């Protein structure tokens, strides 16, 4: 963890987008505090987590930095969160970067609009590595957004990326 600030400096210097996956931040105060420190650098290009993780971050930024242990899930797993679309939108506006909250329905917000992507599936949480793979796919697509930026918003572009991933998972 001590090297993340150096990594951020190098990423900014070389214009490399930073995709943050706050794995298990809803499960404990230490992980959440590290994620909040990363967000406060204003260097995050995209925040992607399950709905419980995104809610924990939103709550911590808005309710005295406390973790809602009722959403602890088991390990890095999360649960479907009520009002996740609203939380995703508000968090994207607050931290000024796109936010993705995954679950049975995925939500994407660029702080202007929220997109619902219905291709999430509960079985994906039972397969180890699907969240990590999604992070890699999002990073690859995110880094290729420039040619599309005049045709669609980043939120719409990321919603298409999630749809692509979800449909590929159905095969």
Descriptions of predicted regions:
Residues 3, 7-49:
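Glycine/small-residue-rich loop that forms an oxyanion/phosphate-binding "nest" at active or ligand-binding sites
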Residues 121-138:
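Short glycine/threonine-rich catalytic loop with a Thr-x-Gly-x-Asp
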Residues 1-3, 148:
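Glycine-rich anion/phosphate-binding loops
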Residues 111-124:
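Glycine/charged-rich beta-loop-alpha catalytic/anionic-binding loops adjacent to active sites
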Residues 32-114:
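Conserved phosphate/ATP/ADP-binding segment of small-molecule kinases
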Residues 137-171:
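Conserved post-catalytic alpha-helical subdomain immediately downstream of the catalytic base
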Residues 24-28, 107, 124:
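Short, small-residue-enriched loops and turns at beta-alpha junctions
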């Amino acid at each position: 963890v001590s090297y993340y600030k150096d990594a951020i400096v190098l990423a900014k210097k070389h214009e490399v987008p930073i995709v943050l996956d706050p794995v298990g931040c809803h499960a404990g105060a230490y992980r959440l505090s590290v994620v909040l420190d990363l967000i406060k650098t204003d260097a995050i290009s995209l925040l992607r987590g399950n709905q419980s993780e995104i809610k924990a971050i939103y709550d911590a930024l808005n309710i005295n930095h406390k973790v809602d242990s009722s959403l602890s899930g088991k390990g890095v797993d999360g649960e479907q969160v009520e009002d996740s679309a609203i939380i995703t939108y508000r968090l994207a506006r607050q931290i000024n970067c796109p936010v993705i909250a995954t679950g049975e329905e995925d939500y994407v917000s660029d702080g202007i609009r929220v997109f619902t992507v219905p291709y999430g599936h509960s079985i994906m949480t039972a397969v180890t590595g699907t969240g990590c793979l999604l992070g890699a796919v999002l990073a690859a697509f995110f880094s290729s957004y420039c040619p599309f930026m005049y045709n669609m918003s980043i939120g719409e572009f990321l919603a298409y990326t999630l749809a692509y991933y979800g449909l590929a998972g159905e095969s």
